Amino acid sequence: MSWLEKLLDKNNIINTRKTSIPEGVWTKCPSCEQVLYRIALKENLEVCPKCNHHMRMTARDRLDSFLDKEKQSEIACEYEPKDVLNFKDKKRYKERIALAQKSTGEKDALVAMKGELLGLPIVACAFEFSFMAGSMGSVVGAKFVEAVDIAIEENRGLVCFSACGGARMQESLMALMQMAKTSAALDHLSRVGLPYISVLTDQTFGGVSASIAMMGDINIGEPEARIGFAGRRVIEQTVREKLPDGFQQSEFLLEHGALDMIVERSDMRRKIGGLIAKLTNKSIQPEAE
């Protein structure tokens, strides 16, 4: 067979037709712009394997990867938000709730579970940032307080992963009241001698950062997480000064004493398990190889 016949052989003809790739198979790291296979990224706990950028996780993925398998059950799941003020901005609050519930599959912005961490009984909560920016309203407050109550009743440590834009403006003063309500519950937890570990993830701002996120016996930040009360731009416009580079990142807060430590996501189970074991004078079960 001549070279031309080989070239024209049907087995050697390259298919030039466009093929469609299902949406969501690939994604791009927002930090280094590396194209990543979505399934592999999820297995790596939403951490970029090239630059180690910690991306946001859903609340359920976070709790599922954090708690021991087959040792977890959801709690405080009966609450649903209500538009008691008939609030309307560009959309009605009822519409925003319905859209957020449809897009996330959650009733509100906090998921709470009880289970075990390396064999230690704990209660764990995680904010769902995709639900109205993880904003704290009356349902989030009620779920968190019930999680604290269960931790006290069953003698469990408490862990909370924060990712929040602040108090939910559509609930006005009722949202702001949750800062005092949740803080009082944590005071009760402290008085009975149970540990509370707070993990601040990207991003944690507003009323949550001014209450439950900073009230841990130990406050942990994820790498490069943005943490603060007001945003950088708002502060710069108010004080009319340029803020330092890295301002409001977890590394800056650690350097200035606002955080106790920074822990990578892959090491979170081991580190928090060890802390709770020391604070409760219990032994942990080692991770299976």
Curated annotation (Swiss-Prot):
ZnF segments: C4-type: 29-51
Subcellular location: Cytoplasm
GO terms, biological process: fatty acid biosynthetic process; malonyl-CoA biosynthetic process
Binding site for Zn(2+): 29, 32, 48, 51
Catalysed reactions, semicolon-separated: N(6)-carboxybiotinyl-L-lysyl-[protein] + acetyl-CoA = N(6)-biotinyl-L-lysyl-[protein] + malonyl-CoA
GO cellular-component term (any): acetate CoA-transferase complex
Official protein name in the record: Acetyl-coenzyme A carboxylase carboxyl transferase subunit beta 2
Species this chain originates from: Vibrio campbellii (strain ATCC BAA-1116)
Lineage: Bacteria, Pseudomonadati, Pseudomonadota, Gammaproteobacteria, Vibrionales
Gene giving rise to this polypeptide: accD2
